[in-house]
Amino acid sequence: MAPVSWGQALRNYKPTGQQLFFSLTALLAAAVWGRDRQLDIGLFSPQSQLLALGLGFSLAAIAGYWVVPLLRRIKAGQFIREDGPQSHLQKAGTPTMGGIFAIPAGLLPALILAGRSPLVWALAFVTLAYATIGWLDDWQILRHRNNKGISPKLKLCLQFGAAFLFCLWLISQQGWQGTITTITLPFGWSLALSLLFWPLAVFTLVSESNATNLTDGLDGLAGGTGAAVLAGLGLWLAPQDPAIATFCCSLAGGFLGFLLHNRNPARVFMGDTGSLALGGAIAAIAIVANCLWVLLVMGGLFVLESISVILQVSYYKATKGPDGKGKRLLRMAPWHHHLELGGWSETQVVASFYGLTLLLIASCWLLN
């Protein structure tokens, strides 16, 4: 019998959305429980990451059974781009704006369990700010019954504005002498940036929120990978920043509860309401905890998705001929669509991206 390559094994593995949901949820819950045990934290302690994860999950899962039918009644259906994969056209009409229940469900337990920390409130506000920007975009799409929301320039200005105000608040709380000016790196290294840290922080917030937005293109993809990264950050920060770790795990639980309704075949999409908030929250956590390199590694999938779009657009423009048409590096960008058009099923792509994200999260401990 001929040996089977890794590529062939992945192509032959065809999980269901339900299998992916239960596998990811069980794995993240087990990892969070193990961290609690390692730190000798009881289940009902306010510092229990498993409690935060469970509460966020329960609230989002229950809320979804009420909100999803409501979104259907108000005809909050997704408009599918005609130039996208043809298999996605059957998703037209699936309710969007699912972030309106995933985000509050993930934030509420964090504020109850760790609300004494001003940083937790700041993280909650910046998450809600990006959710509001996303909601405005989603609402305009639904209102005009096409795939065009608010203008890209306005959207970007609002994202930069929210990032600037968040960083300004951090500076006001810490004072100019106490602000973060040095980035911690793996292997005990550090990089002194002085005040240049803050333009980098603003850029990180805007770019990460757009990166998660680009990743939100398949059932369960952004929600599952986002929950994994949030849980990974929570595990990383639990010993030194338990309040921020609680925020991470609570929001991770909210997205896992949302994933119950968003797994393939999706009953609801998170929309920009959820995807912009997800990226904004992850970036804000990395900024306040000064673990930008951890974000870069754990969220490597989001970076790859963004790079695939940048390369596709740049190459197309660079090779544009007299007829106005250029060449493409990928069949379609982002990367997940390239794999789809190459014959991969949605669940195969999602399973592979879950696995990649979990490997990247685990690799952080090797780099530390």
From Swiss-Prot:
UniProt cofactor(s): Mg(2+)
PANTHER family, per database record: PHOSPHO-N-ACETYLMURAMOYL-PENTAPEPTIDE-TRANSFERASE, PHOSPHO-N-ACETYLMURAMOYL-PENTAPEPTIDE-TRANSFERASE HOMOLOG
Keyword annotations of the record: Cell cycle, Cell division, Cell inner membrane, Cell membrane, Cell shape, Cell wall biogenesis/degradation, Magnesium, Membrane, Metal-binding, Peptidoglycan synthesis, Transferase, Transmembrane, Transmembrane helix
Function: Catalyzes the initial step of the lipid cycle reactions in the biosynthesis of the cell wall peptidoglycan: transfers peptidoglycan precursor phospho-MurNAc-pentapeptide from UDP-MurNAc-pentapeptide onto the lipid carrier undecaprenyl phosphate, yielding undecaprenyl-pyrophosphoryl-MurNAc-pentapeptide, known as lipid I.
Localization (cell): Cell inner membrane
Enzyme class: transferase
Keyword Nucleotide-binding annotated: no
Family, per entry: Belongs to the glycosyltransferase 4 family. MraY subfamily.
GO molecular function ontology, one term from the record: UDP-N-acetylmuramoyl-L-alanyl-D-glutamyl-meso-2,6-diaminopimelyl-D-alanyl-D-alanine:undecaprenyl-phosphate transferase activity
Membrane association type: Multi-pass membrane protein
Metabolic or biological pathway, per its Swiss-Prot or TrEMBL entry: Cell wall biogenesis; peptidoglycan biosynthesis
Keyword flag Kinase: no
CDD domains, sorted: GT_MraY
Domain of life per record: Bacteria
Name the record gives this protein: Phospho-N-acetylmuramoyl-pentapeptide-transferase
Transmembrane segments: 50-70, 95-115, 117-137, 156-176, 183-203, 218-238, 242-262, 284-304, 347-367
Enzyme Commission number: 2.7.8.13
Any one annotated GO CC term: plasma membrane
PROSITE patterns cross-referenced by the UniProt entry: MRAY_2
Reaction equations catalysed: UDP-N-acetyl-alpha-D-muramoyl-L-alanyl-gamma-D-glutamyl-meso-2,6-diaminopimeloyl-D-alanyl-D-alanine + di-trans,octa-cis-undecaprenyl phosphate = di-trans,octa-cis-undecaprenyl diphospho-N-acetyl-alpha-D-muramoyl-L-alanyl-D-glutamyl-meso-2,6-diaminopimeloyl-D-alanyl-D-alanine + UMP
Organism the protein comes from: Synechococcus sp. (strain ATCC 27144 / PCC 6301 / SAUG 1402/1)
A single GO BP: regulation of cell shape
